[in-house]
Each structure stands twice: as C-alpha cells, then as structure tokens.
Swiss-Prot record:
Modified how: The N-terminus is blocked.
Physiological role: Involved in lignin biosynthesis. Catalyzes the final step specific for the production of lignin monomers. Catalyzes the NADPH-dependent reduction of coniferaldehyde, 5-hydroxyconiferaldehyde, sinapaldehyde, 4-coumaraldehyde and caffeyl aldehyde to their respective alcohols.
Upper lineage: Eukaryota, Viridiplantae, Streptophyta, Embryophyta, Tracheophyta
Binding site for Zn(2+) 1: C47, H69, E70, C163
Name of this chain's protein: Probable cinnamyl alcohol dehydrogenase 2
C-alpha cells in the first residue's frame, strides 16, 4: 500500500493574491489516514466559482490557493480501513471533503448543508492544515467524500459532472422534477446551464433555454436538444411564454432582476437559484404572491445523489461538452471563462501536464 505514515509533497498551480493568476506551487499532503485514499489527479474541470475563489470575490479567500473541485483521478494508495475503493479505481472528488457526520443534515445524508462542512480548497481540514484543490498532481481524501466513476465513462467527461452535473441534478431530484412531463426553463447557457439542458431532456422534460441574446440559439436547439429558446429582452416572446413553466433553473452567476423570470412560471412554479452571486437580488412580493410561486435555492448535491447522478448520466448517455487544456493554459482559460468564451466547460488535463517534471 505504500508508506501511509509519510507526508508527501504535491505540485499544483495556486493563486497567491486577488489578481487570481495561478503559478506552480509545491506543498505537503497529509499522510494517508485509515479512511483516506490518495488520488493521482488525471483531469479537473474549471468552474465559475473557481474564479470567485482565486479573485477573492466573496472576501473569504486564503492564499496560496489551489482551486479545482471537479476532480477525476486514479486511486494510488488506500488506508487500512478503506472499504469502498482499491488501488487502480477511477474516482471523483467534488466540492466537499469533510463534514461533521453528526448533525441533522449529515444524518439525513445531505451533508452539503452541514454547517461544519469542509471545502476541498480554501478551507482548513481537521488536522489544521489548509485544503487544496484538484489543479494539482495528487490529493488525499476521506473515502466518504470520494465517488467511483462508472466503468466506461471517459474521465475527462466525468469531471464536469462532479459540480455542474450534480448542481442541476440535485434540485430536479429534491423538488420532484425527476420524472417526465414537466416544462422547464434553463436560465443561462454556460457550463452548468448546458448540463441542465442535457439532464432535463434525459428526464423527459420540455426544455426552454432563456438567454440574454440570440448568440447560442442554434447551439441550444440543434446540438443540446432544447425545445425552445427565449431571449429575455424580447418583450413580445416573453409575454407569450408567461405562466408556461413548472420551474426555472437559474444558473446565472452575476446579479440580475428576477421579476422577468418569475412571470414565466405557472402557479406553484419554482425559480431555483444555483448561481453564486455576491450582490443582493430584488423582486416585488406580488410576483410570488399572486401565483404562489417560490424563489428557492440548491447547493451542489449529496454524495448519495452524486453517485445516482453518475449512474443516470451513464445510463442515459449524458455527456458534457468540454474543451481540454493543459495547466500552462489555465490563466488564459480563466480569462476566457470570465468572458463566457468557452463551449461549455474547460477541463484541465492535469496528468498530461506533467506537473512533476
């Protein structure tokens, strides 16, 4: 099994300050504990929240900071009490690497809502050391926060599912939209939004993409399989679509008015916020009162849901649309992501970047 009691060094790319620029960084991994697995990172997706983290947009970043929470790799070492994985398994690691295990959410297997959850980067682990993410050649993770990638699923395709995929799957599951026959809207067609379209279609929904421009109309309808496309500034079309949707998954990660989209919902419809926004959102109360509509939110998903989501995507043939880059391109990728210049998810080929050479 290797030397479990020896700390190992890892090489990643870290931000040092709110400029958000990443550069090579060597740091120490904790020793592989009894319930830990050491993972050699193969691929890691780039999420918009990584931008928030490295640029300290939320005012909580601690540097040096290695981002990356859509991690797929190979198990290279297991602790003595590990029962879920063996050396050689292809596995995934998402946004969480720990929780208290004792609170109400943990006992209900929705540990993403634990008040003592531990983020996979920009947090402090139980040993007092900072956690670092997947833009690195190796990680050590508690087996309870690792999932097995289904056999036959390409690792680079699996990476975005560990955040973008589960972030849309979980609200479908929780709010009862995991059956066919619903009419839904996906607001925003970025990395998360494109997974929303694909998963909703795989569940048998009629899907309308809502965007601020016509730029992605052809892509949405012809390649992603959406049924309709609405431009939010087209007043006539928006009025025609009023009261037509059971739900809207709002993926937009910047401030925007809500009333325009509330008008699209049927009675008892739900506007589900999943974009991380650091400015207040506003609406007038009659917009929800007069249709018994709800504005709610959802945050990633549980480990159990993540396993279900991976199996669902494998069964239905749901894949992510990605652009694979090497680590030395990461700063350019961050700039492009900030400008929405990606179709639809950057995935870093970490192993192919040969960080240790």
């Amino acid at each position: 099994m290797g030397s479990l009691d020896v700390e190992k060094s890892a090489i990643g790319w870290a931000a040092r300050d709110p400029s958000g620029l990443l550069s090579p960084y060597t740091y120490t991994l904790r020793n592989t504990g009894p319930e830990d697995v050491q993972v050699k990172v193969l691929y890691c997706g780039l999420c918009h929240s990584d931008l928030h983290q490295v640029k300290n947009d939320l005012g909580m970043s601690n540097y040096p900071l290695v981002p990356g929470h859509e991690v797929v790799g190979k198990v290279v070492e297991v602790g003595a009490d590990v029962s879920k994985f063996k050396v050689g398994d292809t596995v995934g690691v998402g946004l969480l690497v720990g929780s208290c295990r004792n609170c109400g959410p943990c006992k209900r297997e929705i540990e993403q809502y634990c008040n003592k959850k531990i983020w996979n980067c920009n947090d402090v682990y139980t040993d007092g050391k900072p956690t670092q993410g997947g833009f690195a050649n190796s990680m050590v993770v508690d087996q309870n926060f690792v999932v097995k990638i289904p056999e036959g699923m390409a690792p680079e395709q699996a990476a975005p599912l560990l955040c973008a995929g589960i972030t849309v799957y979980s609200p479908f599951n929780h709010f009862g939209f995991n059956q066919s026959g619903f009419r839904g809207g996906i607001l925003g067609l970025g990395g998360v939004g494109h997974m929303g379209v694909k998963i909703a279609k795989a569940m048998g929904h009629h899907v309308t993409v809502i965007s601020s421009s016509n730029k992605k109309r052809q892509e949405a309808l012809e390649h992603l399989g959406a049924d309709d496309y609405l431009v939010s500034s087209d007043t006539d079309k928006m009025q025609e679509a009023a009261d037509s949707l059971d739900y809207i998954i709002d993926t937009v990660p910047v401030g925007h008015p809500l009333e325009l989209y509330l008008s699209l919902l049927k009675i008892d419809g739900k506007l589900i916020l999943i974009g991380v926004i650091n400015t207040p959102l506003q609406f007038i109360s009659p917009m929800v009162m007069l249709g018994r509509k709800s504005i709610t939110g959802s945050f990633i998903g549980s480990m159990k849901e993540t396993e279900e989501m991976l199996d669902f995507c494998k069964e239905k043939g749901v894949t992510s649309q990605i652009e694979i880059v090497k680590m030395d391109y990461i700063n350019t990728a961050m700039e492009r992501l900030e400008k929405n210049d990606v179709s639809y998810r950057f995935v870093v080929d970490v192993a192919g970047s040969k960080l240790d050479q």
